[in-house]
Amino acid sequence: MRTVKAAAAAATAVIGAGAAAVAAGRFASDAALKAPPGRPLPTEPRLTVHGTAAGQIILTRDLAALRPGRYGLSGDGSHAVVGPVLTTAPHTADTVVRRLESVTHGTLKAGDKAWLTPNVYVGNPSAALGLDHADVDIPGELGALPAWFVPGARDTWVIAVHGLGTTRELAMNVMEFLHRNRFPVLALAYRGDLGAPRRPDGLNHLGETEWRDLDAAIRYAVRNGARQVVLHGWSTGATMALRAAAHSGLRDRVSGLVLDSPVLSWQTTLRALAAARRTPGVLLPLAVRAAQGRTGLYDDGVAGPAPFDGLRIPALVFHGPDDTVAPWRFSRHLAAARPDMVALYTVGKAPHGAMWNADPQAYEEALRRFLTPLM
C-alpha cells in the first residue's frame, strides 16, 4: 500500500510540475504574442527623469539614454521628443543630459518613469507634420482597416506598416521625406491595432497571418490609382512585407521593399522577448512550443535566408548589431545570399525598429538612393 501511495504521490508531483512548466511556457510566450501596440517591449528599460530646464532633460545614465539620435520619450500620460546627448552640459556621474526638443502632451517632472520609443510623432499627419491627409478604411478579411493616406504626385505608392511595440504613428518618421519626394503614402493599422479588427485568437502571429491585411492595402492602392507599390515595414511589419511580396495576388505590382529591423526568425525573437521578461533559459524552448501550439506558427527552419531565395524585387534592409529583438545576423545572411537583390545598410547603436532614429539624415539619404530608380 505504501508503495502504491508513493507512486501516486510521485505521479501527481510529475503531473503538477509538467502543468507548471506548460503554464510558464505559455506566460513566457505572451511577451511576443500579446505585445501591446504602442507600449515598450520588455527589452526597453524604464528611465527616471531627474529634471528638465531650458531645452534639456536629465535622465538616468543607461546605455539606452546614451543612444545617439532623435527619439520619442513616453511616460504614463506624457510624450516628448528628445534629441542627441549634450556631452558638455553639466551632469552627475549617474545621469545623462539630452536635448529636449518638445513636450507633445502631458508633463515631465523629476521622478517620472519614461522610456525611449522610435515613435517621434504622435497624433496624425495633419496635426503632427502639417501634411494634408485623409482617414480611409481599407476592406480587410476581418473588417475595415483604418489607414492614413497622404497624397502625392507619383503613381508609385509607399505602403508603411509598423511592427512590435509601435503603432502606425511610426510611419510619420519618414512621411515628410516621402512627401517631399512626391510619393503617395498609405500608413496602415492592422488587426489588433487600435480601431482595427480584433485578432480572432487575440494573439500576435508576428506577421505570419497579419500580412493579409497588408495585402488588402496593396489592393486598395491599386484600385485607387497606384501603378506600383513599395512596401516599407518595420520589425514584424517587415515580415509582413516579405510575405506579401511572395504571396499577394498583386505581387507583380510590388516594385521594392524597405525592411527596417526585419524579424526573419520568429523563434529567435520570441526567445529574446521571453528572456527579457526574465524567463529562465531552460523554459525558453517551452515558450516556443507554447507559441506554436497557440498560433500554429511553423517550425523555424526559416532562421536563415532560404525562404527568400525567390525574392524577385530589390530590397533595402536597415539593421544593426545592437538590435536585441531581431538579430542582425539574419539580415546579413539574407544580404549575402541575395547580393543581386538585397542591399544592407548597417546602423550602429540603434535598438529594434529605430534605425531611422539613430541618424535620420543618413537613413533618408540611403532611402532616396534606393527609391530613385523606382520612381
For each of these PLM feature ranges, what is it?
Residues 246-300:
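Hydrolase active-site cap/lid region
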Residues 350-364:
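Catalytic histidine-centered segment of alpha/beta-hydrolase-like enzymes
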Residues 310-312, 317-319, 323:
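Short beta-strand/loop motif that positions the catalytic acidic residue
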Residues 324-330:
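Conserved alpha/beta-hydrolase "acid-adjacent" motif
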Residues 203-224, 230:
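Alpha/beta-hydrolase active-site loop
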Residues 1-130:
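N-terminal targeting or regulatory segments adjacent to alpha/beta-hydrolase or S9 domains
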Residues 178-198:
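Conserved alpha/beta-hydrolase
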Residues 155-163:
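Short beta-strand element of the alpha/beta-hydrolase
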